[in-house]
Structure formats: C-alpha cells, structure tokens
Amino acid sequence: MNTPAIASKAAAVVAIAIAASVLSPSANAQPALRPFDPDPFVGVWLHDVARVDCASGTALVTFKAMQMIHHGGTLSDTNSAAPTTRGPGFGDWERTGDNQYAIKLRYARYFADGNLDGYTVVRGNTALATDGNSLTNSSRVEIRDASDALVVTACARTTGTRFK
C-alpha cells in the first residue's frame, strides 16, 4: 500500500474542495441588503391641536405640540404646556391602512406645586397626506386621576406638518 500517495491525493482533494467553496459565488453569497426604507409616517411632526367638544366639534382650547414617530412603532410626544405641569408622552403607533395610522400615548400631569395631578391617555386615528408632509388626526382623550381612575373623556383634533 502506498500511504504517501494516498495521503497526497487526499490532501489534493481537500484543497480542491476548499478552493471550490471559497471561489464559488454561491458559497460566499450574502442576502441582498435592502436600503433602509422607513414608513412615511416616521419623523418629527409639528402639530396644531384643538381640544374640541365631542358632540359639535367646536374648538374649546388650542395649543402647539410636537411628536417624534420612531421607526418600529413607538412615539414620543410633548406640547407647549409648562414643563412643570406636564411630563413627556410616550406611546406607540401602527399602520392600519394606506396612509392611515392608529396612535396611543400617555403622559403625566402635575399641579403647579409639583404634585401628581393624574395622567392623560390619547388614542387617535391619523391620516397622512399623499405627499407625506402633512397629516390630520382625530383623538379620544382620557383624563385620569393620580390613581389612574378615569375621570372624564374629551376629544381632540390635530393638523400637523413634517419638521424639515
């Protein structure tokens, strides 16, 4: 038996197999990388908000607000209330149809002395304009006390533009 010849042939076969696997395009192929393509709702939005009479739609109070819609379905929210009377809002969003979204968020409210007044929960439906640079929203607002019990519900209407 010629052991060195067999070992030499085995080494050659292994070398050819390694070379074939390294040089073969399919052996090193990686999945095609897709460019990052966020939902068109993602971004920073400047809002004009009106708390409205739920029955008539008449504006009762207006204020400015800002939301950041994050990739992946979360959002951050703030408004023009004094920072000592309202905490930041956090929530989530989901796409419900073509340019249609459902949002919900929650923030804490404080008395002027710094004590907790309660919480506000907002649930709304947002329609994104076809150009992706403006939106409208209609929301139901839950005013809750410091123990998180529902006190009253209200309504809000929002128009927004993308911050550029």
Language-model segments: residues:
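N-terminal glycine/threonine-rich, aromatic-flanked beta-hairpin/loop signature
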Residues: T58-Q100, S134
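Acidic, glycine-rich flexible loop segments
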Residues: A102-G132, T136
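Edge beta-strand at a domain terminus
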Residues: S138-K164
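A short, structured loop/turn motif at beta-sheet edges
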Residues: P38-V42, M68-G72, E94-Y101, T126-T136, ...
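Boundary at the C-terminal end of the N-terminal hydrophobic targeting segment
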Residues: A27-P31
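Bacterial N-terminal signal peptides
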Residues: A11-V22
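Tryptophan-anchored aromatic micro-motifs
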Residues: D37-G57, G89-G91
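Bacterial N-terminal signal peptides that target proteins for export
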Residues: N2-V13
